[in-house]
């Protein structure tokens, strides 16, 4: 692999390869290797969050952070000023972790300078306690950031709040105030818990790839060893101070004599000498070398020495094991040698050529030297990050593919993140004519040929595929065998997409699937191979539209509004019908889904569309007792529009379905509709003796005097039935209807039923979006009364006339048909 002028990827010398760069790229067909190297200390500086040289808008100040706290805002743990604060507290935690054992062992009451420093440290930790109540945290189960104040406080109170608060207590002052009781000094050891902050810091450093791992681990192990021996040294000295001065000879340090130097009256010796001697005792005891110059004297010292040495056995195993794992890494070289030996045996057994041998060995050596393989690097990376990598690498190529011209960015992104990169040498056949295709390919670099095999077996070059072309799409989309053989002419870099992944994406992005098929058809004039397959593509388009209509109806039937919206946004036509002529509005109305009905109305569907059985959505809603849905449809101008309404209504009455009849009458069906025998629904109700249904029909202005084919009226049918209540009802209705007409008229006309109309205050030419909401009214006896009522209901006192949908002025109510849309206007 060649390097660029800017420098290549650098590695450590020796058997081990350790990449020192923060970012690097390896690119065969790109511009080379790009590398950006800065100061060797920059990664550590960035890790500590101490790079404050930002722009003017994002400049860090602690004052700004304190202002955020004062306003009650929640601080993100990655906030730059909070990171700086954690580094500040880390320094205090490191100081406190080492000074606390020292204070416990060597001091009984701090001198003034150390006392002031101790108080300053405790104040800093108190501020940190308050700040912790304002810092968001990541939930361990959901991995979401929690910003709720009560949750943050409750979590902290349940965890380390008590320990942190007790650690901040001024135990030196309390010790003196309590009469220098030794038991109080033991509470000082609570501050040792602060060492967990240092441990967490090392954990973060180990996970930061910008900082050398070997260096981090060695520093951590040295810290562990020093801290353990430091603490043990302080405890050894503390045990010696627990005996009175008169018994100093019974302590390890009071009885100690090194050469001519005696440690009698050791309390008067300077602090540095005492600490160094204690540290020496702790280190040699931990190392178990046992020189014998310092040893335990009294029983308490012996017991602690035994416990300490037992602990040192575990600590020593931990330190040695970690150091061995860090230093001994010959296994990597051994794995490379074993793998190379296996490859050589394989190549010899299969007698591979020199060219392919060189490629294989070169690839393995590159893997070893660079510690890089694409699959190994990406397999542990989250899918979202792998998707971003794929978009960076492949999106520029896929956007130029003519097959995806006009497709949505979301669809293209889904294609990109599922691509696999492959390379092919000249002469290789990728697809054979007549084979079943399971992959879709896109050309990034190189040249391929589409070859057709004629009847006599000769080859004919049909097309030349260059960068930004695709192949395999016709076989996949139309579900036919591969029409041509695809062979590599020049070294090619190709992106592969599995058929199943492609079809899964198309099921979600329907509109883009149709766009792809249209792109194929649009290119048929310039592409002979596609022109020959035009009928297959057209058939597939029709099949796709039928499947989409079924999916829309299925979503409407099951009340899945989200799926319905997704399908319509993806290009589904809500006016398309299934094999029975039923639209999504039919199914939503029949199931009583108000939300879906309202959404479909907003999508400007035809509210009066009929299925193959002649049913409208309004009729479906009424059949199933969905009155609220029916009201929505009526408000939008929906009508029953039933063919052979008389026969239909007579059938309903014959079944005795009073609820259904009531809903039909309230939604504008003509109660005087007649069947093939000129019988009205009232004829059927009277003949069957349905008193309740007869009342409903009479109240809906059914004509009592209407005659059937044989000249019988409903009253005649009731007399034949013999139902006295029904006879009286019809006689009263007859007298009422006769009296409501002039004396010269013997019978009222047929169809003296009420008519409804929908009145809008807008111009008939306005679109549905601009039209104001109208009102449904019964048609009164005069046009003046209709205008007056509409003006009052719509609150437009200036209106003076009514227009039809054709912008014609209506001057008589007899000209208004049932369910007609009218427009209230100002006459000029």
Swiss-Prot record:
Gene Ontology molecular functions: outward rectifier potassium channel activity
Domain of life: Eukaryota
Entry-linked InterPro entries: Ankyrin_rpt (IPR002110), Ankyrin_rpt-contain_sf (IPR036770), cNMP-bd_dom (IPR000595), cNMP-bd_dom_sf (IPR018490), Ion_trans_dom (IPR005821), K_chnl_volt-dep_EAG/ELK/ERG (IPR003938), KAT/AKT (IPR045319), KHA_dom (IPR021789)
Free-text tissue specificity from the UniProt record: Expressed in root pericycle and xylem parenchyma, and in flower at a lower level.
Gene Ontology terms describing biological process: potassium ion homeostasis; potassium ion transport
Placement of ANK repeats on the sequence: 545-576, 580-609, 613-642, 644-673, 677-706, 710-740
GO cellular component terms given for this protein: monoatomic ion channel complex
Stretches that traverse the bilayer: 87-107, 115-135, 159-179, 186-206, 221-241, 301-321
Keyword Nucleus recorded: no
CDD domains reported for this sequence: CAP_ED
Recorded topology in the membrane: Multi-pass membrane protein
Record's note on what induces expression: In roots, strongly inhibited by 2,4-dichlorophenoxyacetic acid (2,4-D), abscisic acid (ABA) and benzyladenine (BA) treatment or by potassium starvation.
Other observations noted: Loss-of-function mutation skor-1 leads to a reduced shoot potassium content.
Cited function: Highly selective outward-rectifying potassium channel. Involved in potassium release into the xylem sap toward the shoots. Assuming opened or closed conformations in response to the voltage difference across the membrane, the channel is activated by depolarization. The voltage-dependence of the channel is abolished by internal or external acidification. May interact with the cytoskeleton or with regulatory proteins.
Protein name per UniProt: Potassium channel SKOR
Species, as recorded: Arabidopsis thaliana (Mouse-ear cress)
């Amino acid at each position: 692999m060649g390097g660029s002028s800017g420098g290549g990827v650098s590695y450590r010398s020796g058997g081990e390869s350790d990449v020192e760069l923060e970012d690097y790229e390896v690119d065969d067909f790109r511009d080379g290797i790009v590398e950006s190297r800065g100061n060797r200390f920059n990664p550590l500086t960035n890790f500590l969050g101490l790079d404050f040289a930002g722009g003017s808008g994002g400049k860090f100040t602690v004052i700004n952070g304190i202002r955020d706290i004062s306003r009650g805002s929640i601080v993100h743990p990655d906030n730059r000023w909070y990171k700086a604060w954690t580094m500040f507290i880390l320094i205090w935690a490191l100081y406190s972790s080492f000074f606390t054992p020292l204070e416990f062992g060597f001091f009984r009451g701090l001198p003034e300078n150390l006392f002031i420093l101790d108080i300053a440290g405790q104040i800093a930790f108190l501020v940190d306690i308050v700040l912790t109540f304002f810092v968001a945290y990541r939930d361990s189960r959901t991995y979401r950031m929690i910003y709720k104040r009560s949750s943050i406080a409750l979590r902290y109170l349940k965890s380390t709040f008590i320990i942190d608060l007790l650690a901040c207590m001024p135990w030196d002052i309390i010790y003196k105030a309590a009469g220098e009781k030794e038991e109080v000094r033991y509470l000082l050891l609570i501050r040792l818990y602060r060492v967990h902050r240092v441990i967490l810091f090392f954990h973060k450093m180990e996970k930061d790839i910008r900082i050398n791992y070997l260096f981090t681990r060695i520093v951590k192990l040295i810290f562990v060893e020093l801290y353990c021996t430091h603490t043990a040294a302080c405890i050894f000295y503390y045990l010696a101070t627990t005996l009175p001065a008169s018994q100093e000879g019974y302590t390890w340090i009071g009885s100690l004599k090194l050469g001519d130097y005696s440690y009698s009256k050791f309390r008067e010796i300077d602090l540095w000498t005492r600490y160094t001697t204690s540290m020496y005792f702790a280190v040699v005891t931990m190392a178990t070398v046992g020189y014998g110059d310092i040893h335990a004297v009294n029983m308490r010292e012996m017991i602690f020495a035994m416990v300490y040495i037992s602990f040192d056995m575990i600590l020593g195993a931990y330190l040695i094991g970690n150091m061995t794992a860090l230093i001994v890494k010959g296994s990597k070289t051994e794995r490379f040698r074993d793998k190379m030996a296996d490859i050589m045996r394989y190549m010899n057994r299969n007698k591979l050529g020199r060219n392919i041998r060189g490629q294989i060995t070169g690839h393995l050596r590159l893997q070893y030297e660079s510690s890089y393989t694409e699959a190994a690097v990406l397999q542990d990376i989250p899918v979202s990050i792998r998707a971003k990598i794929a978009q960076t690498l492949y999106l520029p190529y896929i956007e130029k593919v003519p097959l995806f011209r006009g497709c949505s960015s979301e669809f293209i992104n889904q294609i990109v993140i599922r691509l696999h990169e492959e390379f092919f040498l000249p002469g290789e056949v990728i697809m054979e004519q007549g084979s079943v295709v399971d992959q879709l390919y896109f050309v990034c670099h190189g040249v391929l040929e589409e070859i057709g095999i004629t009847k006599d077996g000769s080859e004919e070059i049909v097309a030349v595929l260059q960068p930004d072309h695709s192949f395999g799409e016709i076989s996949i989309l139309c579900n036919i065998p591969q029409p041509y053989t695809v062979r590599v002419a020049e070294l090619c870099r190709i992106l592969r997409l599995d058929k199943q992944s492609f079809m899964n994406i198309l099921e979600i992005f329907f509109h883009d699937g149709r766009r792809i098929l249209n792109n194929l058809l649009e290119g048929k004039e310039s592409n002979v191979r596609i022109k020959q397959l035009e009928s297959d593509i057209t058939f597939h388009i029709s099949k796709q539209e039928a499947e989409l209509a079924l999916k829309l109806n299925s979503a409407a039937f099951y009340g899945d509004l989200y799926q319905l919206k997704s399908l319509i946004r993806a290009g589904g036509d809500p006016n398309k019908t299934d094999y029975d002529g039923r639209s999504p509005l039919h199914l939503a109305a029949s199931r009583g889904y108000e939300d879906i009905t309202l959404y479909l109305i907003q999508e400007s569907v035809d509210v009066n569309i009929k299925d193959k059985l002649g049913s409208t959505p309004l009729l479906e809603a009424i059949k199933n007792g969905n009155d609220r849905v029916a009201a929505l449809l009526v408000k939008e101008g929906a009508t029953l529009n039933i063919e052979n309404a008389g026969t239909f209504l007579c059938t309903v009455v014959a079944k005795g379905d009073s609820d259904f009849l009531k809903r039909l009458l309230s939604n504008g069906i003509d109660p005087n509709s007649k069947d093939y025998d000129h019988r009205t629904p009232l004829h059927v109700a009277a003949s069957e003796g349905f008193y309740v249904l007869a009342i409903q029909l009479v109240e809906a202005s059914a004509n009592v005097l209407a005659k059937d084919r044989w000249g019988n009226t409903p009253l005649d049918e009731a007399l034949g039935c013999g139902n006295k209540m029904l006879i009286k009802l019809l006689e009263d209705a007859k007298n009422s209807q006769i009296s409501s007409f002039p004396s010269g008229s013997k019978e009222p006309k047929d169809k003296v039923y009420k008519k409804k109309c929908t009145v809008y205050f807008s111009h008939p030419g306005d679109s549905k979006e601009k039209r104001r909401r109208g009102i449904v009214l019964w048609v009164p006896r005069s046009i003046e009364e209709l205008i007056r009522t509409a003006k009052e209901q719509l609150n437009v006192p200036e209106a003076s006339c009514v227009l039809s949908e054709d912008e014609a002025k209506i001057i008589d109510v007899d000209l208004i048909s049932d369910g007609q849309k009218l427009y209230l206007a100002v006459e000029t």
